[in-house]
Amino acid sequence: MFRFIKDSILELKKVTWPKYNEVVGNGKQVFWLVLFVSIFLGIVDYLMFLVVTYVF
């Protein structure tokens, strides 16, 4: 178990971590994408609701 933890720490030191600006930029992109997709799906859901209530 201790070897696993030691090896994990050594591997984490080799990782190239992203800069703060990259994290913030990617976070903004994810936020806008999620917002756009949720609005789009909300509109599609509402239109399908209207079609179903009109047909039945």
From Swiss-Prot:
Which Gene Ontology cellular component terms are annotated?
plasma membrane
Subcellular localization, as worded in the UniProt entry: Cell inner membrane
Its main subcellular localisation, reduced to a broad class, is membrane
Which residues are listed as membrane-spanning?
A: 30-50
From the UniProt record, give one GO term of the biological process aspect: protein targeting
Asked if the Swiss-Prot or TrEMBL record annotates the protein with the keyword Transport, the reply is yes
Q: Does the keyword Transmembrane apply?
A: yes
Could you tell me the membrane topology recorded for this protein? Single-pass membrane protein
- Record's keyword terms, sorted: Cell inner membrane, Cell membrane, Membrane, Protein transport, Translocation, Transmembrane, Transmembrane helix, Transport
Q: Name one GO molecular function term.
A: protein transmembrane transporter activity
Record's HAMAP family? SecE
Per the record, the similarity remark reads: Belongs to the SecE/SEC61-gamma family.
Q: Which function does this protein serve?
A: Essential subunit of the Sec protein translocation channel SecYEG. Clamps together the 2 halves of SecY. May contact the channel plug during translocation.
How does this polypeptide assemble, per the annotation?
Answer: Component of the Sec protein translocase complex. Heterotrimer consisting of SecY, SecE and SecG subunits. The heterotrimers can form oligomers, although 1 heterotrimer is thought to be able to translocate proteins. Interacts with the ribosome. Interacts with SecDF, and other proteins may be involved. Interacts with SecA.
Name-wise, this protein is: Protein translocase subunit SecE
Organism (species):
Borreliella burgdorferi (strain ATCC 35210 / DSM 4680 / CIP 102532 / B31)
Its ancestry begins with: Bacteria, Pseudomonadati, Spirochaetota, Spirochaetia, Spirochaetales
